[in-house]
């Protein structure tokens, strides 16, 4: 017991003794304190009540009107109110170290569940819906007050703490493939696309249609199969499967044509059919899914506005992230067939195997307590109260295990599913609430060989959405320098990035950048003119850009050339 100031738990039991009496001016309290050595100290003392007579009369009138009895004058703040909303959803947080509670509360926000009951009708930009969310067996009182149980964000997993062939080292987890096939942790990702008939000056406008079916000529038409899944109005058929991952070219989501980009393109527009551009909307690169809903409405300027939702099934796979409510996060390292998974004497096969090394150094005792509590709750068909400071105690949970024929330690004898031999050591197993987080490997997987570059720096674009290159940073460069792999450095940082042949004037030490004049078909130095001694130098375009930016500041950088030896 800690009697100091700032303690989270009130060590005293307070009893009001004279509340039923009339015209009380002071309250008599009986305070009982249980000391750590087991002895109880009892004291009685009085407190003056800061009530005016009118307040007491008002309370008495309320008593008569509501037929209630005034049983208290003061309310003590509950101990769990020192926690925030997310932290109060974590069971037994007082048994964890502070960083783990903080990490657990951060991941509660990332868990998948049911974001809204009308998600089929809401055109949100992105939505992620778990198929079968469950209420947690071990919960807290805050779950009722926050209505978390009406829209939960996870599922109850049968978990065993053991390693298997090293596939769950470094926080990875091993998952039962049969559980995944029975829709454990399965979710759907929904993305909304917006297409609009934009209007331009001069009466020109975009048209949502199947390109190439009208009277106008269309530049940049795709193959006929690319538009085969579109209806006559240019919109896709619901429940049509679209993909950018396979060879079939069916990534067109909305067929659309636009007027010529520049007026020069509209040559002969009055003499012949107008020429238009193909500007269909495609689904995002690297994604696939089914057309879920198509909403057609009007935009603010009375144009046609279309909103299409795409639905993608997200089945747990290698690399997907799962986490308990105690900051124990990890990605799937292996999916194991049901017949190869370990099983208990009762034939229970765990859904998840986590590594024993994840527990001791992190001191997440609440993770272990919740596994025991989930085991008792699932056997006795009741919920376990894991509210901070006042939840069901460990002794009660151990007694519940004994009542149901289990070892009070939570450990069980398990058999190797691959060899049929019983493990020499007992394995700790239980039921715990796990969350699937929205960090999915399918939405992060990215590779590139060749692709587009930026206009300014002529280096590869950045980011998965723009099909960008993978950054070769300073530390990677330093590794190659330490290896002495100079040709690899040149290949990565120059040839495969922004290599550039720069023309440099060497006429009497000029050192300025020259250029090639296509009209006169000769190299020209802006300082020396046509009759200049120009040489090609291989460098990066970023260096050439630096020289140009220095010129804009009024600083002329001159390059000195030497013969290569």
Where are these regions (language model features)?
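Conduit-forming functional cores of very large proteins
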Residues: 1-565
């Amino acid at each position: 017991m800690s009697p100091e100031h700032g303690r989270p738990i009130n060590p005293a039991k307070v009893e009001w003794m004279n509340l039923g009496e009339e015209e009380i001016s002071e309250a008599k309290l009986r305070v009982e304190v249980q000391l750590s050595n087991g002895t109880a100290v009892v004291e009685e003392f009085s407190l003056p009540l800061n009530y005016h007579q009118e307040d007491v009369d008002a309370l008495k009138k309320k008593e008569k009107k509501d037929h209630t009895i005034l049983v208290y004058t003061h309310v003590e703040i509950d101990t769990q109110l020192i926690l925030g909303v997310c932290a109060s959803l974590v069971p037994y947080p007082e048994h964890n170290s502070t960083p783990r509670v903080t990490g657990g509360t951060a991941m509660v926000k990332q868990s998948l569940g049911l974001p809204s009951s009308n998600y089929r009708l809401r055109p949100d930009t992105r939505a992620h819906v778990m198929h079968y969310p469950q209420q947690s067996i071990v919960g807290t009182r805050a779950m009722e007050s926050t209505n978390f149980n009406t829209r939960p964000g996870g599922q109850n997993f049968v978990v065993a703490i053991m390693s298997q062939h090293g596939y769950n080292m470094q926080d990875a987890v091993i998952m039962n493939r049969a559980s995944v096939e029975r829709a454990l942790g399965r979710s759907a990702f929904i993305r909304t696309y917006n297409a609009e008939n934009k209007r331009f000056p001069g009466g020109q406008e975009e048209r949502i249609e199947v390109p190439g079916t009208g009277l106008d000529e269309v530049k940049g038409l795709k193959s006929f199969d690319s538009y085969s899944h579109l209806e006559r109005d240019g919109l896709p058929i619901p429940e049509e499967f679209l993909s950018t991952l396979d060879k079939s070219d069916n990534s067109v989501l909305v067929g659309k044509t636009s007027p010529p980009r520049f007026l020069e393109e509209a040559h002969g527009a009055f003499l012949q059919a107008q020429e238009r551009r193909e500007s269909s909307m495609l689904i995002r690169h690297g994604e696939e899914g089914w057309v879920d809903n198509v909403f057609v409405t009007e935009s603010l300027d009375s144009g046609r506005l279309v909103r299409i939702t795409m639905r993608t099934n997200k089945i747990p796979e290698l690399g997907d992230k799962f986490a308990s409510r105690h900051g124990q996060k990890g990605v799937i390292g292996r999916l194991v067939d049901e017949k190869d998974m370990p099983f208990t004497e009762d034939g229970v096969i765990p859904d998840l195997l986590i590594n024993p090394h994840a527990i001791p150094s992190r001191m997440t005792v609440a993770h272990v307590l919740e596994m025991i509590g989930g085991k008792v709750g699932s056997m006795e068909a009741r919920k376990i109260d894991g509210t901070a400071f006042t939840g069901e105690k460990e002794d009660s949970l151990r007694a519940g295990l004994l009542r149901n024929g289990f070892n009070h330690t939570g450990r069980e004898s398990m058999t190797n599913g691959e060899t049929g031999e019983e493990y020499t050591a007992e394995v700790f197993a239980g039921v715990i609430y796990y969350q699937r987080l929205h960090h999915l490997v399918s939405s992060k997987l990215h590779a590139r060989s060749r692709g587009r570059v930026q206009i300014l720096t002529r280096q590869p674009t950045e980011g998965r959405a723009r099909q960008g290159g993978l950054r070769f940073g300073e530390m990677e460069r330093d590794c190659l320098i330490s290896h002495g792999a100079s040709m690899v450095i040149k290949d990565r940082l120059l040839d495969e990035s922004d290599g550039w042949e720069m023309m440099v004037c060497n006429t009497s030490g000029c050192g300025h950048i020259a250029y090639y004049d296509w009209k006169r078909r000769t190299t020209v130095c802006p300082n020396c003119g046509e009759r200049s001694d120009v040489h090609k130098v291989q460098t990066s375009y970023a260096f050439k850009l630096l020289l140009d930016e220095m010129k804009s500041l009024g600083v002329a950088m001159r390059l000195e050339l030497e013969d290569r030896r």
